[in-house]
Regions:
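P-loop/Walker-type NTP enzyme "switch/lid" segment
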Residues: 2-12, 19-92, 166-171
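Short, well-ordered beta-strand core segments
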Residues: 78, 100-101, 127
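Inter-motif core of Ras-like GTPase G domains
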Residues: 85-108, 114-115
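Short, conserved loop/helix-junction motifs that constitute active-site signature segments
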Residues: 95-96, 119-125, 148-149
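Beta-strand-loop-alpha "switch" segments that mediate conformational coupling across diverse proteins
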Residues: 135-137, 145-174, 187-192
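Conserved C-terminal guanine-recognition region of P-loop GTPase G domains, centered on the G4
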Residues: 111-133
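Short, aromatic/basic amphipathic alpha-helical patches
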Residues: 46-51, 141-151
Length: 193
């Protein structure tokens, strides 16, 4: 099974979401858990080299061919961290995904980029938005939630803006962040049954 973490826009929280989802999967007892890093920048791989997460195996797959092989060549749970902007690779990956988590931010140009991402996902594939680095209680967040709800796009999570999560590999995984991403993972996996 593969859970794709995808958005054609960069800087929205794909790598952070991928690492936290993989750690949440291990905590739920999934074995093996692969974090498939499809981004040529290899940010997930670098994160796990600096701060390994016990039970998570990193697989670098920066080309369409290696990504297809990685997604089909395992019998566990794959969390796939995708690159921004490579629409051909994203199209290929979404067609092989069992569920798609779409990290985004509240407001601005985010909506149009998520819509492009949604158009790539086959109709039968469960998908949901995760609003990352959310500033709780703001108009931007309220408007984003209202907009996605009106578009009938499930919101699988709202991850509050926190220094502990934003610190990335420089810090240990933030306990509250793990709990929030566990809820996202449950929603993604529930849609695959």
């Amino acid at each position: 099974m593969n859970v794709l973490v995808s958005n054609v826009k960069g800087g929205v929280g794909k790598t952070t979401s991928s690492v936290y989802l993989a750690a949440a999967a291990v905590a739920r007892g999934y074995d093996p858990v692969l974090l498939i890093d499809a981004d040529r920048q290899a940010s997930s791989a670098e994160w796990l080299e600096e701060r390994p997460v016990e039970g998570v195996t990193i697989v670098e797959a920066p080309s369409e061919r290696t990504l297809t092989r990685a997604m089909s060549g395992h019998d566990g749970l794959g969390i796939v961290d995708t690159p921004p902007g490579d629409e051909r690779l994203l199209q290929s990956a979404t067609s092989a995904a069992d569920a798609v988590v779409i990290p985004t931010r509240a407001g601005g140009v985010e909506f149009s980029r998520v819509l492009v991402t949604l158009e790539m996902i086959p109709a039968r594939t469960p998908r949901g938005v995760v609003i990352c680095a959310a500033r709780l209680g703001t108009n931007d967040l309220a408007e984003a939630i209202a907009w996605w709800t009106a578009q009938k796009v499930p919101i699988w999570g709202v991850i509050p803006e926190r220094v502990g999560i934003a610190a990335g590999p420089e810090a240990r995984l933030y306990r509250e962040g793990l709990a929030e991403y566990d809820a996202v993972l449950r929603r993604a996996l529930r849609g695959t049954r």
